[in-house]
Regions:
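Bacterial Sec-pathway N-terminal export signals of envelope proteins
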Residues: 26-74, 78, 84, 228-271, ...
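Small/polar, glycine/serine/threonine/aspartate-rich low-complexity segments that form flexible
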Residues: 28-29, 76-111, 236-245, 291-325, ...
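Periplasmic alpha-helical coiled-coil/stalk elements that build and connect Gram-negative outer-membrane
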Residues: 32, 142-257, 364, 368, ...
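Sec/SRP-type N-terminal targeting helices
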Residues: 49-53, 66-67, 113-140, 190, ...
Length: 441
């Protein structure tokens, strides 16, 4: 009995230990940095996986085109039943020729000797592979941009929530102090009501900010292709990026759109159209093919297969095909030329638009950098004003309205400061995407 009890207890202990271990793991939250978020997204996001699969498909198509240069072999077979024999007339004599049953079978091997259209198709498919690679690069840049801005958005929501929560706790403390003084008869009911209103007015903002944190984290999880229930924390705050803002003011990097993915893709599309035009011109060129046949034939009047006599024969043929006239080829050339002209005009127009957009991002970064510098000083002054208002109220020389006003000014200065850093960072992320900068850890 004791042995059976021992056997029954062991599984229960193991289950309990496993539950404890799982509980410990669940309690450990992932501390996420921007680089980690980007790397997870690049490895798990379906958009990137689809782009990589597209490259593989294009490479397979390219190999299929190259295979057109290799010989092709096929086994053929035919049976012919003569219904009415052919009648021939010679020197006034008529006679019929032909056998009721004819069989033919063998192997045919063909090889393209000169196929200019195939050679142009090979160049076209290679450019198509390059275009797929560039599109995959654009997908990665777009995903990095989305994850980066989502991470900054989450930091902004987190920092805003921290500022509002601290302000709410301070307003609660102010209300507690004012209420205590009111009960002692040292302040008026108006001061008590003002402090309470200030506290309650902040509560909806705190709740909204908390919801904003959850929503921004959820958006980040979706981009990383992670389960929405996963809990994690963000490392750092927007204040940690202040050095990047001031470093951006000092540096004077050359701004160029030569790596822009949109322009690169349009250039490749123009190249493909030009190659397609060259391919269409090859429709006027001759093609030469070599063919080898090794066949067996048999003719019989009956169906006695075991008595059939099969006779082999073989031949080699060289065929030349010269297109003389096909009007569709001329219209195709005209259409392709028009498409090239349209795409080149769109490319020039897009380049001008992107240059304007680049300047807009630079202006936004400069304006945000100036705001960060100004708002940082505003926080220092607002903190001093709040401390003075608090001291004046404590000694009875200030009013609760002045204290509330100072508290609001400090909160607003902190929120504006973090917003300015966020605006700078998002404009910088958009600029890097526009300039075609690849992510480097």
């Amino acid at each position: 009995m004791r042995k059976m009890c021992s056997i029954g207890i062991r599984p229960m202990m193991m289950v309990a230990l496993m539950q404890c271990a799982l509980s410990t793991i669940a309690q450990e939250k992932l501390a996420l940095t921007l680089d980690q978020a980007i790397e997870i997204a690049l490895s798990d996001n379906p958009t990137i996986q689809v782009a990589e699969q597209t490259i593989q498909l294009k490479k397979i198509s390219d190999r299929e085109t190259v295979m057109g240069l290799l010989p092709e072999a096929s086994i053929t077979g035919a049976y012919t039943r003569t219904i009415k024999k052919q009648t021939m007339v010679m020197n006034g004599m008529k006679f019929q020729v032909g056998i009721p049953n004819q069989y033919q079978g063998g192997i045919t091997v063909s090889l393209p000797v000169f196929a200019p259209a195939l050679y142009k198709s090979m160049k076209l498919t290679k450019t198509d592979v390059e275009l797929a690679v560039e599109q995959a690069r654009a997908s990665k840049q777009d995903l990095v941009n989305q994850v980066t801005k989502a991470f900054y958005q989450a930091l902004l929501a987190q920092d805003s929530y921290a500022v509002l929560e601290k302000s709410f706790k301070q307003s609660e403390e102010n209300y507690r102090i004012v209420n205590a003084k009111y009960e002692q008869g040292r302040v008026s009911e108006f001061d008590k009501i003002s402090a309470e209103v200030q506290m309650r007015n902040l509560q909806p903002s705190v709740i909204s900010a908390r919801n904003g944190v959850e929503l921004s984290k959820l958006q980040l999880l979706v981009l990383m292709n992670i389960e929405p229930e996963t809990e994690f924390t963000l490392q750092g705050s927007l204040n940690d990026y202040e050095e990047i803002v001031f470093a951006g003011i000092l540096t004077n990097e050359t701004n160029s759109l030569e790596n822009n993915s949109s322009l690169a893709q349009m250039d490749m599309n123009v190249k493909m159209l030009q190659q397609n035009l060259s391919l269409n011109k090859q429709s006027f060129a001759p093609t030469i093919a070599l063919q080898f046949n090794y066949m067996y034939t048999c003719m019989a009047n009956d169906f006695k297969f075991k008595d059939y006599e099969w006779n082999p024969y073989s031949n080699v043929s060289l065929s030349v095909s010269i297109p003389v006239f096909k009007y569709k080829n001329f219209s195709t050339l005209k259409k392709t030329n028009i498409q090239i002209s349209q795409l080149m005009q769109n490319r020039d127009y897009t380049a001008r638009q992107l240059a304007m957009q680049q300047q807009s991002y630079l202006n936004s970064m400069n304006a945000s950098a100036e705001q960060v510098s100004s708002n940082k000083e505003a926080i220092i002054q607002a903190q001093k004003g709040r401390d003075i208002a608090e001291k004046l109220y404590e000694v009875g020389r200030g009013t609760v309205l002045e204290l509330n006003s100072a508290e609001v000014a400090l909160t607003q200065a902190k929120l504006t400061y973090t917003q300015a850093i966020y605006d700078y960072l998002t404009a910088k992320a958009d600029l890097e995407k526009l300039q075609g900068k690849d992510y480097v850890k």
